[in-house]
């Protein structure tokens, strides 16, 4: 089983990279986000690898971080999500943005990924809502927001507020943190307009 490869980029294709490791070229399929962050041919690169072995095929998937690889695995635990859809989601959202979307039950953000329809997006946010917080690191903002939501806070206004703040140029982590603070400081039970207003107040501090 291959877990990690360190070598020199030989070529970058539309959905894969060929990594030369001591004269052997390994083809690793990657998300568009990962491919965009790799260097050019001739430059060094390190990829965390997920190996798929089938009867007539051995396929490698490459990731810039172990965290991205874990999300790739987790996404495929959802019914109807295979490697192609998982890579499409990771091409559209960072691990942190994906965690935020799941915490907020924000199926709209996930359905932006190519090949991900509304039904699959709903399954992703529903089936992973109790699994995503098990991860840490850059997903901490979404976990904090999920804790602020609790059981009695409607997710739709919160998702709308986070979306509106990101449309204003803030990152999803900044928006999630601001909305979490807004909920904590009196915004619980409010509509999206109130949460946006309170969120902007938090961001201006």
From Swiss-Prot:
Pfam families: HHH_5, RuvA_C, RuvA_N. Residues 153-205 are annotated as: Domain III. The keyword Transferase does not apply. Residues 144-153 are annotated as: Flexible linker. GO terms for molecular function: ATP binding; four-way junction DNA binding; four-way junction helicase activity. It comes from the Bacteria. Homotetramer. Forms an RuvA(8)-RuvB(12)-Holliday junction (HJ) complex. HJ DNA is sandwiched between 2 RuvA tetramers; dsDNA enters through RuvA and exits via RuvB. An RuvB hexamer assembles on each DNA strand where it exits the tetramer. Each RuvB hexamer is contacted by two RuvA subunits (via domain III) on 2 adjacent RuvB subunits; this complex drives branch migration. In the full resolvosome a probable DNA-RuvA(4)-RuvB(12)-RuvC(2) complex forms which resolves the HJ. Belongs to the RuvA family. This is Holliday junction branch migration complex subunit RuvA. It comes from Rhizobium meliloti (strain 1021). The gene is ruvA.
């Amino acid at each position: 089983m291959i877990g990690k490869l360190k070598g020199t980029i030989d070529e970058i294709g539309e959905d894969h990279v060929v990594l030369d490791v001591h004269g052997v070229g390994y083809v690793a399929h990657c998300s568009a986000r990962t491919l965009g962050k790799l260097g050019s041919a001739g430059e060094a690169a390190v990829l965390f690898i997920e190996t798929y072995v089938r009867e007539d095929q051995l396929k490698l998937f490459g990731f810039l971080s172990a965290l991205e690889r874990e999300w790739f695995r987790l996404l495929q635990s959802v019914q109807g999500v295979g490697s192609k859809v998982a890579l499409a989601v990771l091409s559209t959202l960072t691990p942190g943005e994906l965690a935020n979307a799941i915490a907020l039950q924000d199926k709209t953000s996930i359905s932006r990924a190519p090949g991900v329809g509304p039904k699959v997006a709903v399954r992703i946010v529903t089936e992973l809502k109790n699994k995503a917080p098990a991860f840490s690191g850059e997903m901490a903002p979404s976990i904090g927001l999920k804790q602020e939501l609790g059981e009695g806070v409607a997710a739709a206004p919160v998702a709308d507020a986070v979306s509106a703040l990101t449309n204003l140029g803030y990152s999803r982590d900044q928006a999630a943190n601001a909305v979490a603070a807004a909920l904590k400081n009196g915004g619980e039970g409010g509509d999206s307009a109130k949460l946006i207003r309170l969120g902007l107040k938090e961001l201006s501090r």
